[in-house]
């Protein structure tokens, strides 16, 4: 069986970080929303035994068993006693290590495809498996925008209206941020007294005044260029701009699709004029994760379109 789906990117509209726990993780309260931007994940499940293979065309450094999507497939096979060969192909559109959840979303997409192909309906077991793979993976198995608590495993549905965004990803390697570093910098800032701990609060109805990210200040302190990118977004008309997750991607919220498109073009023009090494992406939040669909060849898709267009109206 061959299945395809979109693995959506996400942004954190709210990210509040509690103190470090005994297990080394932090308690979180975060509002995550999926985007209409993401990777295309193609999963083939053979009827015969065999290995897991994962390829990312154009990104050979992401091929192989260390890709989180491949690790998700291996974990699924172990958990549910499956030995069938699995082939994964990812068309990468979400920037890597960007605070947009690309790898976690790919992993969740693989779990959803395998669950459908092999008729696994144990949602609790899938959710537990997702958390073993990564803290953000359970969110991408969920229904859509959600408040996440704990490590990210306690999810509650959130109502978020469609938001038009411009994302700016600094491709300069010197601005890359590892998630572990971002949390460590926050712990150090709090220990020194330069950043006071926040109360996590309770999930509530989304409103723009909630927008915020506890990791932003310590990351900007170490990577001042991020502040300039936030300034680009505000200067282009964003009503607000923050860093997503552990960064380094920043995003701005705009009053409509037209305003966002104009801002993206303006920021791209600035990038060509000197702010080199940035990727500018236009996106909109969505209210549910994409469905898993059977794979169809481009030829069969075009023939269906031709048949539809030839019908009398």
UniProtKB/Swiss-Prot annotation:
Family the UniProt entry places it in: Belongs to the GHMP kinase family. IspE subfamily.
Protein source organism: Anaeromyxobacter sp. (strain K)
Biased composition (Low complexity): 292-304
Catalytic residues as annotated in Swiss-Prot or TrEMBL: 10, 136
Pfam families: GHMP_kinases_C, GHMP_kinases_N
GO biological process, alphabetically ordered: isopentenyl diphosphate biosynthetic process, methylerythritol 4-phosphate pathway; terpenoid biosynthetic process
Protein name as it appears in the record: 4-diphosphocytidyl-2-C-methyl-D-erythritol kinase
Function as written in the Swiss-Prot or TrEMBL entry: Catalyzes the phosphorylation of the position 2 hydroxy group of 4-diphosphocytidyl-2C-methyl-D-erythritol.
Alphabetized InterPro entries for the sequence: GHMP_kinase_C_dom, GHMP_kinase_C_sf, GHMP_kinase_N_dom, IspE, Ribosomal_Su5_D2-typ_SF, Ribsml_uS5_D2-typ_fold_subgr
